[in-house]
Amino acid sequence: MVTDFVLQTHPEPGNVVHYEYALAFGSQSEMAPYYTAWQNLISKPDLDRRFGSIFIMMPLGALVVGDFYGTEAEFEASGIPGWLPKGEHRHIVLTDWLGSLANSAQNEGLYLTNLPAPFYAKSLAFRREDLPSPEKIDRLFRWVDMQHKGTPLWFIIFDATGGAIGDVPGNATAFAHRDKILYYQSYAVGLPLLKASKDFITNFHGQVLEACPTAFGTYPGYVDPALVEPQRQYWDANLPELERVKKVWDPMDRFHNPGSVLVK
């Protein structure tokens, strides 16, 4: 099989600002105002596209991390630092393109281990109009406080997206989530992985759906064996066209996984 890849490239950025804000809390409910402020920032329609950010909820606090592709002066002039939480531990690294890649590689290296670790995960994608209100965020974070997690190794990642990816029409490629500006992924890790941990992740997802009833879909590749209608969740409105292509080019379904497009 021969496949052509057509890529549109851009010059590498000259400067990169990597930032980390560590926030310590005694309870998840204390974290809600900080998450609300972060959500307000990443959902701004005129947000500088050079900015990327992740909010990570953890048992003892939160971590806000990301990159700004520009100089420190441009980062400050954007007004973004004024929206970010004023954590006790603030860490800013000024680097270049290669340095930012090395930093990302170093962070990825921290995840590598020779010990297999069972985990359970859920995820969901949000358009701007799907995002929860401050009141619903407060209720959601208070709910987390009251739950038995079954493991100390759990975390919930809120990952800002959008920007130039949304300039491409939604039906131009297989990727259907160009109107989304946020993904969340929740994880529980355990040796062994207890039912209580799975229940916590599953029920948190249910609480999110209750707070954001119009949110639908998730990023292709976020594997979830319990996902309802995975093909529709992954490919959304593009699924009929992908089913047509699948029928022509892979009628025997040789390229198959539980979430892949099926032959119809």
Question: What are these model-predicted stretches?
Answer:
Residues M1-K264:
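Soluble FAD-dependent oxygen oxidases
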